[in-house]
């Protein structure tokens, strides 16, 4: 009896394999596409949450130093001094001091002394030491007039609470020189929480040169919940999705932040679905921001074959730790470095058979440098990063192929220019976004660039183009109209991109798309509509995509 059952099982399996063999590559591509989309969507959500509200202080009015009063009454009359000496200068280098104007050798006037004190004060302000003060000291035995600098320090920081944790936002600053950029950094960290509107006052302290930093915060409710629906899904798993996002500010009283995103398809969930969840936690510490994130997604769809229906399903897991460090900032730019370690596990199945080629396990180490620049009419930001696959946590060379190695190296470049344009009497917003990636190594499919994804070249609902190397450029022109409590923002978009797949010798492939749409905001409600069309430019045999209509509705509680 056992032999008969075994023979029957082998017969059915052989028949199924024979029928589905011609579609094996299609199944691999479909499963890989679902996994890639899920991982890249969760990565995009994490990056947007981390970047959101990070640089508020650059956009607000900065703390300014009061103009220094003249050290001496203005006069061109010669003073009875032989020269000038400085004392109390510890925060300026000899190279900084060499930029000061020289004094006349024969006749030093009050005007010369006042010019020197202004230049010296300006040097301190340019370095961010806005409380430095210069005082006159009586001449020494050599007849040299003294300029004594009180450089200024933070005597005390007060006004913190569970929403604005001064120990983590301004760590170790008490007793140290008062530097404007360090205060701006702490304000940025405080204001990255949507419930905070934090400002500070610099007040005189009790000690000579001391200042008291008093924090003032207007606090709103610490939580937000956003619910919505859209038709951004895929045909195979369902177009319409329900989405929900919940955020909570300072859950542990550490000026920390936690966010949970969830989405699920709505159509026929018993037979096809796509569900995804992303959790993010971040903690500030001065110029550092530490983050941890996790995401999980699963999908299932059924493919109709000539004589039966087969099930394609799978899941992805992603866990990561990240650290961001702002190493330089001034009144109109911020430069930062970040390091990230990410673990990815992908499991795709055709019926009960695991698709090994499209089910890699990856451990990635990433280093990146970011630059943000405030321009007269806009903002420019750029990020350059390098990812390296590591042989950790079960990641290694794929057992079924010598060409699929998890220890690859990939470079990425992201740049965004957002600027205001005056056309006649109207003000428009032009946004140009560029993304490119390159690797000399063959990449696992989940690391490819999806050119026809909604976040790349807009306008595709059926065709797919993806590959190891490539780039795309998104261009969007918009204008906002304020109608009382309602804001209407229509837009036009034009995108182009190219990819170079390594799995064949077809060379570069190109795509382009155009779009038009509008966003309507009324209080906490949002409605967005978009009509787009995409074209595959490098393969005329590819069926043309139809006009795509996308809709999104959301409400924030």
UniProtKB/Swiss-Prot annotation:
Give the residue range of the signal peptide.
Answer: 1-18
Top-level taxon of origin: Bacteria
Q: Which residue numbers delimit the POTRA domain? A: 79-152
Q: Where in the cell is it found?
A: Cell outer membrane
Family annotation (InterPro entries): Hemolysn_activator_HlyB_C (IPR005565), Polypept-transport_assoc_ShlB (IPR013686), POTRA (IPR034746), ShlB_POTRA (IPR035251), TPS (IPR027282), TPS_OM_transporter (IPR051544)
Please give a single GO biological process term from the UniProt record. killing of cells of another organism
| Any one annotated GO CC term | pore complex
Which keywords does UniProt give here?
Cell outer membrane, Cytolysis, Hemolysis, Ion transport, Membrane, Porin, Protein transport, Signal, Transmembrane, Transmembrane beta strand, Transport
Q: For this UniProt entry, what is the primary localization, expressed as one broad class? A: membrane
Q: Which Pfam families match?
A: POTRA_2, POTRA_3, ShlB
Q: Could you cite one Gene Ontology molecular function of this protein?
A: porin activity
Q: What is known of its domains?
A: Probably a beta-barrel protein.
Function, as annotated, reads:
Interacts with the cell-bound hemolysin. Necessary for the extracellular secretion and activation of hemolysin.
| Entry's family note | Belongs to the TPS (TC 1.B.20) family.
Give the protein's recorded name.
Hemolysin transporter protein ShlB
